[in-house]
Amino acid sequence: MNQSDSITIVGAGLAGSEAAWQVARAGIHVELYEMRPLKASPAHHTADFAELVCSNSFGALSADRAAGLLQEELRYLNSFVINSADKHSVPAGGALAVDRSRFSADITEKITSHPLITVKRVELQKLPSEEQITVIASGPLTSKNLAEDLKNFTGIQECHFFDAASPIIAGESIDLRFAFRGSRYDKGDADYINCPMNKKQYLSFRDELIKAEQAELKDFEKSSSNFFEGCLPIEELARRGEDTMRYGPLKPIGLWDPRWGDLNNREIRREKRAYAVVQLRQEDREGKLWNLVGFQTNLKWGEQKRVLRMIPGLQNADFVRFGVMHRNTFLESPKLLNASLQFRKRAKLLAAGQITGTEGYVAAVAGGWLAGTNAALLAMGHKPIIFPRNTMIGALTHFISDWELRSDSNRKNSFQPMPPNFGVLPKLTTQIKEKRARYAAYRDRALDELKASIRNHTCLAQELGISKLPIYRS
């Protein structure tokens, strides 16, 4: 197989795996480059594709939530990765969380066994030739050599921020005499383990977090202390203020241990309710592994063990994985990309995933779907798909590719990653004050326009006699 007969995809993370599958589903050969395990990254632990290095959650399931809406759009588009996430989901209240080992193993097995996908376990150090259709989905941990070549190609200094992952605890080591099962506001089943704290416990815990020794940054990381606001280390939250954690990952609202008594009794509620609550979310289907929700950290491992064992119920916690922090690299996309995810200066070069400046697992999958589908369309000589801004996938890709959609003050500042959120969608034509109803209206409009845009493109494809386009769900 000649390289000219195939599409090159760099990186087998969430975006790269999705892109590879969409290209192959269109009947086109793929050369998929993945440097692991030949060259390790600072955050990955395995050689599997689509390894989840931070949380195991893809966010809210409900389509009237931003991440849930993007998931629903991807289900309609028959996303390979979201289908696998649904297949390997674990209980998580109203969220889509997965058994990360089974999920990644499933993705890896399906891709490596696909007859149209050739996997190359080598580091691609330079961009392929201009004639080669290529999707760069190398992720936020892009290797130094490729990042340098991208910087030379774009002529723009790389952007980066620090990201971190939470520790994982062995379930059998959690003491349920001090913790309880339950979901916030009793949504779904009792899918979380909750560790309540009184005020004295919380303040002592915060003090020790602030005093705890952090892991030393690598030389290339010391020049910056930028954090992505959606994934701040817990010790950074502790430093920001006495109540910051209580209004963030440790918020106690909506959580009640039945052993405390009648929730409807005002006196009991006032006396017993927790001052703060640490939540643990199930990592695997069997419930043997639990991650500390929102506890991304860069503390030294010994300090993690010492401080986190102050949490009620975790006095004897067995740490299966400690938290880590690493630097994430991304492109200054508004200066470089179109909403089709093509580079403006090279139409056959596309980018997808977190390297484009979208944040979160579902956004990475969406970018992979769009870049892979558009790469296939380019190979067949057709125009790429650009989704309307009223869809979540379209809103995100327009937002990262158009400076005009950012406020004047934001345009003056450096580009920062953007997760799925309703703020990037255009306003509704009618004002709806009630939040849930407003979000439901965004959802309905987005799904209607997504389906219409796909129908229109499919009709065009049928008119032109193209039978190899990906099959969409009706």
Curated annotation (Swiss-Prot):
Main location: cytoplasm
Protein residues bound to FAD: G11, A12, G13, L14, A15, G16
Top-level taxon in the UniProt lineage: Bacteria
Keyword Transferase: yes
InterPro entries: FAD/NAD-bd_sf, MnmG-rel, MnmG_N, TrmFO
Compartments it resides in: Cytoplasm
Catalytic reaction annotation: uridine(54) in tRNA + (6R)-5,10-methylene-5,6,7,8-tetrahydrofolate + NADH + H(+) = 5-methyluridine(54) in tRNA + (6S)-5,6,7,8-tetrahydrofolate + NAD(+); uridine(54) in tRNA + (6R)-5,10-methylene-5,6,7,8-tetrahydrofolate + NADPH + H(+) = 5-methyluridine(54) in tRNA + (6S)-5,6,7,8-tetrahydrofolate + NADP(+)
UniProt-recorded Gene Ontology molecular function terms: flavin adenine dinucleotide binding; tRNA (uracil(54)-C5)-methyltransferase activity, 5,10-methylenetetrahydrofolate-dependent
Presence of the UniProt keyword Flavoprotein in the record: yes
A GO biological-process term: tRNA methylation
Cofactors named for this entry: FAD
EC numbers on record: 2.1.1.74
Protein keywords: Cytoplasm, FAD, Flavoprotein, Methyltransferase, NAD, NADP, Transferase, tRNA processing
GO cellular component terms, A-Z: cytosol
Enzyme class: transferase
HAMAP family: TrmFO
Function according to Swiss-Prot or TrEMBL: Catalyzes the folate-dependent formation of 5-methyl-uridine at position 54 (M-5-U54) in all tRNAs.
Stated family: Belongs to the MnmG family. TrmFO subfamily.
Protein name stated in the entry: Methylenetetrahydrofolate--tRNA-(uracil-5-)-methyltransferase TrmFO
